[in-house]
């Protein structure tokens, strides 16, 4: 089977294959949640191993299908009862399904051995498309976050097989939209990925989103996916733990077998070395001389602003908060903690609200910057989220981008792209929203930080009759958030340049 610009369907079309596969999936066990969906995976054989179940199919249409029940490795009552029994014996369970790693033998795995994918045929299935549409008729990205994280988890377990450690999402290193895919009803999506780097007990997983105008064959390899159809890239880091000792677990080594696989491996290796070095340093890097002058200029300028206007809005006034009780329907495959994709979705929805209210328009998601899950979120805990606009950047016609008009309207780090399919292909405003999350267990009055999510959105100038606003920090803490936001915008711009060349 050959691929050109689109993935062509085999004889009989995707419709019959799709219906047959969907019926087959309904009988599989889904250890992530009890919600079935219509996604496909590359594995077709039956297995009693939880990792072989189509867990990545459990997150689609969660809100629409939460009244349906599918077979599951363990109900919440089963997991709750077992945990109580183990606690009486002085034992702590990390996972209900993964209680024995089966083997500690380490071998080599190729990228092809962990390759997995999901099909989201929006063009062929209008009701599936309806579950992924937002109020503006565009892609509801929060739904996609759940699928990305669940697929990454499936890939992690395929790489570790036959061992069965407890794999958890340690960080989301970046999710970036490369192209606009506004009319998703005209496309069939494929989410596909594999392990791209391994350490001793950690692994990086790269997932890409592809958009095709034609129907998609239910079977293909990674090499057959055309790069020109990529609209999204995502990188996750997973870590493995031994369910018996609760310590790190040595995983299979990745063996790159092609030039491109070695390039991806070295890139990931360099990034992880940089991330480890940054973790040893202070969480906040001191401002440079240029940034110090910027902070001083912002402080002076903010003193003269007595009230906000349509073009100037205080950072403190951009805050949105949300508090959620963590219910077991959104638990991960291990039963006792909340699924990371659900957290990404909830944080995104709040960030979207903040960006939409700030711009009085429908923002378009551009990127999720590096995010580390500092603490897992237990089922039965209270999750508090606070979102605020931390940085804005105005992209104007190139001839007007060379000078800073104020400390709050600096020379942008990004440039208007000549590619009409790119998000930043026209004048507009880049809005960065920071979402801080904290968790509180009911048996204590103290809360602890769970993670910080940084989402970037773009609002075209053409979507608003008046100029889009700049965010105004007033306190030193807010100004440092602004400075860090500008650093992140520059980092994203550099990353886009790297992958474009």
What is each of the regions a protein language model found here?
Residues 42, 46-94, 181-186, 196-288, ...:
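HotDog/MaoC-like acyl-thioester-processing domains
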Residues 58-140, 254-340, 353, 488-501:
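Catalytic strand-loop segment that frames the active site of acyl-thioester-processing enzymes
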Residues 110-117, 143, 188-190, 204, ...:
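Intrinsic-disorder/low-complexity, polar/charged segments enriched in Ser/Thr/Lys/Arg/Asp/Glu/Gln
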Residues 112-118, 126-130, 136, 141-168, ...:
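The feature marks the first
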Residues 167-182, 187-190, 215-217, 336, ...:
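A cross-kingdom feature marking solvent-exposed beta-strand/loop segments within repeated
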